[in-house]
Structure formats: structure tokens, C-alpha cells
């Protein structure tokens, strides 16, 4: 029996929403609406599979659930009742990045390369033990650390955390965002033999070399403010 609302990111389906299977369902939906509202626009556009545990939903319950998600800009893919939600929804897919449940500290660790067309969204920090290919997207409310090449889109501190960072062994994103500030990597593919860290300074995103390399290079940051 579950008593808490749990939202987990996956690379296979987008989001997995686990709902409590005790208490009035209307009360659960009220708690869900409050949780989503407190996350701002983080989950907007998210595709969701919902697991309701041992609860059996009526057609009216399903409609109310879908409306609650739609009000937060989310898309309901399916509703599952009974069984193991992690086994059914997060079963490994050949060649797909692994996205295990977040360990202590609300950090999501992905142990494979994130491919083009795949998207990771997580409420917390994200660590990727692999590359982020062009066409892949990583969004986090906290830091993003890539132990490989970052060539896709990365958005750290997406709910407004300007102290968030994006770090990578090779930092060449097609687009880089921290909070509301948007930048991109310089044109070309200059050699890089050390990790780099991107952070906000003033209203620009700058890239700092690793501790032993005290060089600082500015991104071609437009300092654009994301439309809200």
C-alpha cells in the first residue's frame, strides 16, 4: 500500500506517477494538484503513465485524473491498476539509458548514453554516466552533471534556481539553460582535454575550466529570459 505521491522520470515513457491506493480518490487528486502547482512549469508537456496501486478507478475517476493532469499541461498516456509499477513501466529497453529510482538526496543517476529523441526530466539533480547526444534533452530542477560529452539540450535549475550548474567532460550543447538564462556553445569543435562547468554570472552563462585550469570563457549567451 502506498501513501505518498511519487513522480519519477524515465527515459522510456517520460514520467511515471505513483498514486496512493488508500483514502478517497478525490482527496488524492487534490494533493496531486497541489504538488504539481508547487512545481511551477516543470512538468508542462510531460507524458505520464499513472499507477494507482490496488485501487480500482471508475470512468469518472479516470476523467477527473486526466483533467487534473491537463490543468498542469501534462498528457496522460495510461492508467495501470495492480502489479509492480516499476517492473511494468520501467522494464529495460534494449539500448535505452537506465534510469534507476533516485537515491538519497533526490539525485537521478542514468548509466548509459541518452540518445536523440530521448528526454529526461527530474525534480532534483541528474548525473549521466555517458553522453548526451544531439537531439536529446535533459531537464532538472537542480544540477546536471554529464560524465561524457554533452551535445544535446540541457536545462538546469529549470524552476528558477540560478545557483544550479551544468558540468560535462566535453561541454558542447546545442542549447544550454540555467534557470531563465539561455546560451549555446560556440561554433566549431575546439579541442577540450578537461571538464568544464557552466554557471550563471550576472545575467550571462559562463563556462569555467576545471579547478586546475583557471581559464574562463563566456558562452555566446543571449541572456534571454524564457517566456513565462
Swiss-Prot record:
InterPro entries, A to Z: CAP/MinC_C, MinC, MinC_C_sf, MinC_N_1, Septum_form_inhib_MinC_C
Keyword annotations of the record: Cell cycle, Cell division, Septation
Any GO BP annotation: cell morphogenesis
Keyword NAD (UniProt): no
Keyword hit for Nucleotidyltransferase: no
Source taxon at top rank: Bacteria
UniProt record similarity statement: Belongs to the MinC family.
Subunit structure of this chain's protein: Interacts with MinD and FtsZ.
Function of the protein: Cell division inhibitor that blocks the formation of polar Z ring septums. Rapidly oscillates between the poles of the cell to destabilize FtsZ filaments that have formed before they mature into polar Z rings. Prevents FtsZ polymerization.
Protein name: Probable septum site-determining protein MinC
UniProt organism field: Symbiobacterium thermophilum (strain DSM 24528 / JCM 14929 / IAM 14863 / T)
Gene from which the chain derives: minC
Amino acid at each position: 500500500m502506498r501513501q505518498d505521491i511519487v513522480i519519477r522520470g524515465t527515459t522510456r515513457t517520460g514520467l511515471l506517477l505513483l498514486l496512493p491506493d488508500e483514502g478517497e480518490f478525490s482527496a488524492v487528486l487534490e494533493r496531486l494538484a497541489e504538488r504539481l502547482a508547487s512545481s511551477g512549469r516543470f512538468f508542462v508537456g510531460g507524458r505520464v503513465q499513472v499507477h494507482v496501486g490496488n485501487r480500482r478507478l471508475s470512468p469518472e475517476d479516470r476523467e477527473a485524473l486526466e483533467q487534473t493532469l491537463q490543468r498542469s499541461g501534462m498528457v496522460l498516456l495510461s492508467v495501470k491498476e495492480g502489479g509492480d509499477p516499476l517492473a511494468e513501466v520501467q522494464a529495460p529497453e534494449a539500448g535505452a539509458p537506465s534510469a534507476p529510482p533516485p537515491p538519497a538526496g533526490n539525485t537521478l543517476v542514468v548509466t548509459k548514453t541518452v540518445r536523440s529523441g530521448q528526454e529526461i526530466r527530474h525534480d532534483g539533480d541528474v548525473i549521466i554516466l555517458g553522453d548526451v547526444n544531439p537531439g536529446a534533452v535533459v531537464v532538472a530542477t537542480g544540477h546536471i552533471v554529464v560524465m561524457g560529452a554533452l551535445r544535446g539540450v540541457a536545462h538546469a535549475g529549470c524552476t528558477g534556481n540560478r545557483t544550479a550548474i551544468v558540468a560535462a567532460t566535453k561541454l558542447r550543447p546545442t542549447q544550454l539553460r540555467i534557470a531563465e538564462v539561455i546560451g549555446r556553445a560556440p561554433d566549431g569543435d575546439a579541442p577540450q582535454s578537461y571538464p568544464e562547468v557552466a554557471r550563471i554570472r550576472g545575467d550571462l552563462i559562463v563556462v569555467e575550466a576545471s579547478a586546475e585550469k583557471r581559464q574562463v570563457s563566456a558562452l555566446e549567451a543571449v541572456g534571454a529570459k524564457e517566456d513565462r
